[in-house]
């Protein structure tokens, strides 16, 4: 996510305004302040170039609330902003992670605004166990193609542990005018399904934006101290224009022992039909130690082996990426 620098005064003003709004709203609704600070010290290498430094891992804070309207109806809202925990720089747009209002009841839930695609949460995010799919060990191979802004969505009620959500991201381009940045005259469409059957959890996600699309299936199984998950995905033109189709797969596993967690995560992306040498493999070994329910210290080693035309995580075609990291994460 791109960021721009904001002055301390501007950031303080924005935060204070949000806090005052939340305080005023609490008189008539249930409002919660929440967030996460997640920071690592890492030694990274891209090809033969290396660096050691402090890195942010999708730190964020937000406000969410709900008001009971009576008759089974509830109105809710969510505002969530990312920030760089290593520098303090705020994300732009400020509430890029989430800014929505929703109406819910026995009929389900209607959502309006901006949020991260539910197809992603139903598949790739669900099986990324060691560091919440953030930072340098995040899933570099998953094809995320959704337009996050200007969305209208409907989520069904829970039917025997099954839910379905569909959304449309409106392009908002005025007819007869040239396309502006981010307004290409095409709506985006996103679908997500989740189902639980005892220890087995299944999910699916589909997204389409003009000539780019993806479809993924996920399974996750928990038995005793063992966790095992994985997904398969087929996308078209997600990383290369006119690249054709590509298949990818990821497996993750964890063993829980008291306050300790041992993690392994392996992903493989095939080459696009029209881009020879665009295949890649990613693997991560990690260890987490939970100091409390909200705080953990952790370490991991992650590596992405890129084909000659692939630049996953490295940003340089043909260059491999690797990182050795230790970090602290605190939820509030």
Language-model segments: what does each one mean?
Residues 47-50, 138-139, 176-179, 237-240, ...:
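Extracellular loop and loop/strand-boundary signature of outer-membrane beta-barrel proteins
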Residues 49-59, 95-97, 146-150, 185-189, ...:
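Residues that define the transmembrane beta-barrel architecture of outer-membrane proteins
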Residues 20, 64-68, 104-106, 155-158, ...:
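Structural signature of outer-membrane beta-barrel channels/translocons
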Residues 73-75, 107-111, 161-164, 199-204, ...:
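Repeated loop/turn-to-beta-strand initiation elements of outer-membrane beta-barrel proteins
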Residues 28-43, 49-171, 185, 194-198:
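Outer membrane beta-barrel
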Residues 183-286, 302-303:
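Detector for outer-membrane/organellar transmembrane beta-barrel domains
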Residues 1-30:
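Cleavable N-terminal export/targeting peptides
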Residues 191, 289, 303, 319-332:
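Outer-membrane beta-barrel "beta-signal"
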């Amino acid at each position: 996510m791109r960021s721009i620098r904001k002055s301390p005064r501007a950031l303080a003003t924005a935060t204070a305004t949000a806090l005052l709004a939340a305080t005023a709203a609490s008189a008539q609704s249930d409002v919660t302040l929440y967030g996460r600070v997640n920071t690592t010290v890492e030694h990274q290498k891209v090809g033969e170039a290396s660096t050691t430094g402090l890195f942010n891992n999708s730190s964020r804070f937000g406000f969410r609330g709900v008001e009971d309207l009576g008759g089974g109806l509830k109105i809710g809202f969510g505002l969530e902003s990312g920030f760089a925990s290593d520098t303090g720089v705020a994300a732009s747009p400020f509430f890029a992670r989430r800014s929505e209002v929703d109406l819910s009841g026995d009929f389900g839930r209607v959502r309006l605004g901006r949020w991260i695609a539910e197809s992603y949460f139903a598949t790739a995010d669900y099986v990324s166990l060691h560091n919440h799919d953030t930072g340098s060990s995040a899933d570099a191979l998953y094809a995320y193609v959704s337009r996050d802004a200007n969305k209208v969505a409907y989520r069904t009620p829970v039917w025997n542990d099954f839910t379905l959500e569909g959304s449309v991201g409106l392009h908002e381009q005025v007819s007869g005018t040239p396309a502006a940045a981010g307004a290409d005259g095409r709506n985006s469409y996103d679908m997500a399904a989740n189902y639980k059957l005892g220890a087995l959890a299944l999910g699916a996600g589909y997204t389409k934006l003009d000539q780019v699309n993806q479809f993924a299936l996920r399974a996750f199984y928990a038995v005793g101290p063992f966790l095992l998950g994985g997904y398969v995905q087929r996308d078209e033109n997600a990383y290369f224009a006119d690249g054709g189709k590509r298949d990818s797969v990821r497996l993750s596993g964890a063993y829980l022992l008291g306050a300790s967690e041992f993690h392994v995560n392996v992903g493989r992306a095939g080459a696009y039909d029209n881009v020879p040498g665009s295949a890649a493999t990613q693997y991560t070994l990690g260890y987490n130690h939970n100091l409390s329910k909200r705080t953990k210290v952790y370490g991991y080693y992650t590596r992405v082996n890129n084909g000659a035309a692939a630049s996953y995580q490295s940003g340089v075609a043909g260059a491999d990426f690797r990182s050795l990291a230790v970090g602290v994460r605190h939820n509030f």
